[in-house]
Each structure stands twice: as C-alpha cells, then as structure tokens.
Amino acid sequence: MTQADNQNPKPMVLIILDGFGESDETTHNAIKEANTPTLDKLFRHYPHTLLEASGRAVGLPDGQMGNSEVGHLHIGGGRKVPQDLTRIDAAIASGEFYENPALIEALEKAKALNKAVHILGLLSPGGVHSRDNQIAALVELAHRCGIKKIYLHAILDGRDTPPKSALLSIEKITDQFHAYGNGKIASLIGRYYAMDRDKRWDRTEKAYDLLTQGTAQFHAPTAKEGLMLAYEQGNTDEFVSPTSIHRHNETPITIEDGDVVVFMNFRADRARQLTYAFLDDHFTAFNRQVRPKLSAFVTLTAYAKDIHAAVAFPPLELHNTLGEYLSARGYRQLRIAETEKYAHVTYFLNGGQEAPFNGEDRLLIPSPKVATYDLQPEMSAVEMTNKLVEIIQNDDYDLIVCNFANPDMVGHTGDETATREAIQVIDDCLKRIITALQSVGGEALITADHGNAEKMFDEKTNQPHTAHTSNLVPLIYVGREAQFCKEVGALDDVAPTLLYLMGLEKPREMTGRNLITLK
C-alpha cells in the first residue's frame, strides 16, 4: 500500500519503553522473568521486528552501548546523527582537540593570571555522559599550555559502569598527573550528588559546596584512599559521599576567584544543575555561600540556551525532525513523560530544539521523590497512563509520544526483583493504553531507545549489572494488517516508518527507511 492509499489513524501513539532490550538469556533477565501477559500477546499477534540501538547504528563507536539521549535523537531525527562522543574522540585522534579555540582561550587566561584550571567531569570509561580518555586529553592540553595547577574534581560513575570500577580510571589519571608533576585529583563525589537532573537541589548543593568550600564528609590523602574509604562505608561509585583529597595538614583545594573551570561531560541533561549553580546570576535553588568570580567557564558541549558559557563543541543542527515535519503540516502532537525522561521526549526527540514546535503540547508527570527507584519501581507510570488514556479518548492529537522510564531507571539500581516489578507495571499500563486506542481507532508503535533491564547481573565482574546494554530493541506495530521487512532495522528507521503509517512521505533529510508494508 502506498502513502496515497493509506488512511491516517488518529491518534498514532509512539510508546518508548526506556531501557527495554531483547535478549535470549533468561537468567537475570528482568523482562523475561516478569509476568507480562500484554507484551506476550502483542508479540504473538502483532507484527514486530528488532532494531539496532548501539554502536555505529546510532552514531557511536563500534561496540558502544546506546543511551537515552542518543536513542531519542535517532528516533525523532530519522537519520544517523554523529554523536558527541564520536566527534570529540575523532578530534583527539586528529589533533584538532588540542587546537580547540574555546579550550585554548580559557587555558591561556589561567596561564596569564597564574590561576588554577579545575576540570569537572564524570571520570568513567562508560561513554554515556563522558569518557575518561577525553578528560586525560584535556589534562594533556593544559600541560602543553604550561598550566602549573591542574585539578580534577572527579565525579564517579557506577551506573553506566560496574558499581565498583572507578579505581582503574583513578589510577590512570593519577599516573598522568605524576608524569606531568603539575596537578592532582582534588575531590571525589558520586554522580548521585553531582549529576542530579530531577531538581533534587540538596544533592547538587553538596557537590557545589565541595567544589567551592571543600565541605566534605570525608578527607583522604590520595584519591585511591578516598575511594577505598567510601567502599568501607558501604558505598558504590555512584554514591560516594563528598570527599576532599589532601594531606592532613593541608587545606582542601577549591575553586577560587580568577580560576578557570572546564566541565567535561558531553551529555547535557545531568550537567545542567551544577552548571547553573556556578553561572546563574538569579540562582535561588539553594544558598551559595561562596560564588567564585571565574576567568572562564567552558562546557564541552552546549548544555542549554540560558547557560552562558564558552562551548568547546557546539551542537550539530538537525532540520525536519519528526516533530518539526509534522508541525509544518499542521498536525497536532503531544509529548508526555515523567520527569526523568521528559527532556528525552521533548528536547532530544526534537533534535536539540528547546522550544516546542507549533501544535506541540507537552505534559510532565513528576517522578516520585525517592532516593533510588528500586524503592518505588512503579515510579509514575500509572499516573501517566491515567492521563494518557484520558487524552486518547478526547481525540485531540494526531501523534502522541510517551516514554516509560521504569525499565531503565529501576534497571540502573541493579535490583532484579524491583526491575521485574517495574516491567509488570508497564505491562499493565500497555494493556490500558492499547484498549483505549482500539476503542477510538488509534494505533501504536512500541519500541525502546536502548537495552538495560534484560541484563541485571554481570558474570564477568560478579556484580549487579547497572549499565545499558548493546542489545537490539523491539519495534511492535499495533494497528492494521501489515508486515515488517526481514532485515534488522535501526532507531533512525522509526520516524520514516511512523510517517508511512500516518500516510506521509518522509522528508529528504531523513535517511532512515520505512520498515513496514500495509497489506
């Protein structure tokens, strides 16, 4: 059937199950272990296929696991988008990184004033928010520029990496500092505090006070000893308490007037809150007892339009994304998600566009205020489904995009039982959504942005698996009689497929392909 013959269903709902990968493994697979009558029925009775969601298929290096930002960019973009990880690694390999104007200008200011350069960043090989080789490249660049005081304030991962795996990265960068003789790791803190994105400002405040005042629950003479101290307290990397690294008779190293700060996270969403604390003149989220007057603050990528900082790698602009294309044709669309994934169905799905397009409404369902989501694995899925069912029945939108955060956010805790419960909640929600859609003649495409919940234990490290995976993800069509092509697709094929089902040609900017044929 061609687009011309295709009757536009209303509404079309794109359901993104965040962190829902496909694996034949049944052991430690929370998806396979869960009781999922709705998903079982969908896979039995409706056309479905599998999609690549990692590596080169989503603009990342070979073997690099996907993530929510990359996944939504490709789902909404309908094309391969070179990712910041790949761009920056390529710049390091070519030498362009060491000539980057924003970095060079900031480092020269520090040198001229004989001030310190403070590097903030997730010290991790994970490649989701940062990569430790890029931090090492900046240390090398600062050394080349003749900076005498280079301080790394290391945020620790344990979420996109095994829970206790920071030591290798710490040892590598410590060896580099020893070789240069002009810097050190000045502090440690878990990403739980320094990289909150859900307005839990008390966590951000702890990170800010550590950086600006040296306020720390723990002190240690070396970063390795600080990490071991955290492990003794029962903390994994993600939850390392603020720890200042200095000898007993020395004062903490802090960010002071005239210093230069470079934030080396390339993913924006979890870097924003801490950046606002430094740069926002009208900041009110907590009381900044100290606010250093910096010579420069550089972000590796652009974090937000209202963050006024030098940017080392400005974003690539995407035109005619799914949202923009539908908006230009007068289609009404809704984006709905809970707090943890709201930016993904709005900003990232729109290719980095902050403001909604004409005809695009947005609905934010607050995520529950709990320390970790294994404590409330249902999160806000039921509340979101209640609203979604009501909206479907009102028949106001041509396209609705929703994201269920549970498989990813609960999967990140490493709690297999809680993740299984999360999957079962999602299954119940899907039943209600599909029932509502079928009552009004609507249709659904169900997919995921990357894997996670299908692997809850790592046999190699003998630790809970808290990171994403490189597994394929499903694509299920709930609607008219149709057949998917036999070849495995990729996330950039979702938008062209969706447009075909809505009776529209894809724009020329979309290089992804339609994967389905209506009978």
UniProtKB/Swiss-Prot annotation:
User: Is the keyword Cell division assigned to this protein?
Assistant: no
Question: What protein name applies here?
Answer: 2,3-bisphosphoglycerate-independent phosphoglycerate mutase
- Function (record text): Catalyzes the interconversion of 2-phosphoglycerate and 3-phosphoglycerate.
Q: Which reaction does it catalyse?
A: (2R)-2-phosphoglycerate = (2R)-3-phosphoglycerate
* Biological process terms in GO annotation: glucose catabolic process; glycolytic process
An example of a Pfam family matching this protein is Metalloenzyme
Return the cofactor note field: Binds 2 manganese ions per subunit.
UniProt record similarity statement = Belongs to the BPG-independent phosphoglycerate mutase family.
Quaternary structure and partners: Monomer.
Q: Which organism is it from?
A: Coxiella burnetii (strain Dugway 5J108-111)
Q: Name one GO cellular component term.
A: cytosol
Q: Where does Mn(2+) 1 bind?
A: D408, H412, H468
Q: Which residues form a coiled coil?
A: none
Top-level division of the source organism's lineage: Bacteria
Residue numbers binding substrate: H129, R159, D160, R191, R197, R267, A268, D269, R270, K341
Does the UniProt entry include the keyword Amino-acid biosynthesis? no
List the SUPFAM superfamilies hit by this protein, alphabetically.
Answer: 2,3-Bisphosphoglycerate-independent phosphoglycerate mutase, substrate-binding domain, Alkaline phosphatase-like
Cofactor(s) the protein needs: Mn(2+)
UniProt-listed Enzyme Commission number(s): 5.4.2.12
GO terms assigned for molecular function: manganese ion binding; phosphoglycerate mutase activity
Binding-site residues, Mn(2+) 2 = D18, S68, D449, H450
Catalytic center residues: S68 (phosphoserine intermediate)
Give the keywords, sorted: Glycolysis, Isomerase, Manganese, Metal-binding
Q: Cite the PANTHER family for this sequence.
A: 2,3-BISPHOSPHOGLYCERATE-INDEPENDENT PHOSPHOGLYCERATE MUTASE (PTHR31637:SF0)
- Pathway(s) the chain acts in: Carbohydrate degradation; glycolysis; pyruvate from D-glyceraldehyde 3-phosphate: step 3/5
